[in-house]
Amino acid sequence: MPIEPAREVAPGIFLIDTGYLRPGLAACYLIRGRDSAAFVETGHVHAVPRQLAALQQLGIAPEAVSHVIVTHVHLDHAGGAGALMRALPRATLVAHPRGARHLIDPTKLWAGTVLVYGEAATRALYGEPIPVPAERVVEAPDGYSLDLGARPLRFLDAPGHARHHFVVLDDATRGVFSGDSFGLSYRETDGGPNGPFFFISTTPVQFDPAALHATLDRILAERPERVYLVHFGLVEGNLAAHAAALHRGIDDHVRAARAAPSGPGRHEAIKAGLKARLLAGLAEHGVPLPAARALEVFENDLELNAQGLGVWLDAAGR
C-alpha cells in the first residue's frame, strides 16, 4: 500500500493515515511545537514507516520528537509504540497509568489479542509489539500536562471505552485528541444535510456505558471546537450535537445487547441488532451511502462492538 503524505488539518497538526485495514480507517497525528514535536497515537507496528516518512516530509529530525503519546493501549492505537520509540532516540512515551505497564511488557496485551484473532492473523493485522524501556515511559494521570514550546497539552482521564484511556486537549486549536472516547466518524458517511455521522465504539474488553456517558460530558465541558479522531480525521463544529448522538448510540448498543437471547447465537444476534441500528441511524441522518457499502465501511466496528457488548453482558452476569 503506497504511503500517503501527511496533511495539515489544523495549525501545526498533521494527520497520518496508518494504513490499518484500509485507507481512511485509522489515523495518528504529529504535533509540531515551537521547540519540539510529538506523535499522538502510533497505530500498529506496520504504521511506523509512515510516521518516519512524515518526519522526513516535514523536515523534522527524529531527534526533535520529544514525546509519543498513546490515548490507550489497544493495538490499533499503540501497537507500534515500541518500534517507533526505537527510531526516536530522545522521545518519552506518555501513557495512561493503567496502560503503561503493557507497553513496557506487552506480553499480556499480545496474548489477549492472539486469543481473539489467532497468531497468524494478529501478526498480519498489527505486527508484534516491541517492549519500551521503563525509563522512557511516563504515566499521565488525570490533570497531567506537558508543553511542546508555546503549545501546552492537557490530559483528562477518559474511561468508558477502556479503563486505560485518556484524552489530550490542545489549547492552541481548542481541539481534543479523543482516541476512541468520542466514537468514530468515517469520511465515507459525509455529504448528507446533517453533517458528520458518529458511531460509538464498544471494543472489548472494558466497555462501561455509564463511564462513557460521563466521559462524553467531561469532554464537552472543556468546550472544544474540534475533535481529532483516530477513526477518522478532523471534525469541527457542532460537537454538542455529535455528543448527543453518541449518548443515544451508547443506549442503543446497550439495548441491542440486552435484547439478544442468551446461548450460542448471542453474538450474531447482537451483531444483527447493531447492523439494523446502524442502517437506521444512517438513513435518519441523511447519509447518502448505499446500505451494502455502509456495512463494508463499518464491518470491523460491527464485529468488535458485538464482541465488546458480549464481554460486558458476561461481566454483568447476563
Give the location of each predicted region:
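Divalent-metal (often Zn2+) His-rich catalytic cores of metallo-beta-lactamase-fold enzymes
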Residues: 175, 210-267
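Residue-level marker for buried hydrophobic side chains located in beta-strands
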Residues: 38, 69, 93, 175-177, ...
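Metallo-beta-lactamase
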Residues: 44-46, 64-76, 102-157, 163-228, 232-233
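Metal-dependent catalytic neighborhoods of phosphoester/phosphodiester hydrolases
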Residues: 78-88
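C-terminal regulatory/interaction regions
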Residues: 255-318
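Conserved beta-strand hairpin/beta-sheet module of binuclear metal-dependent hydrolase folds
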Residues: 2-58, 168-178, 184
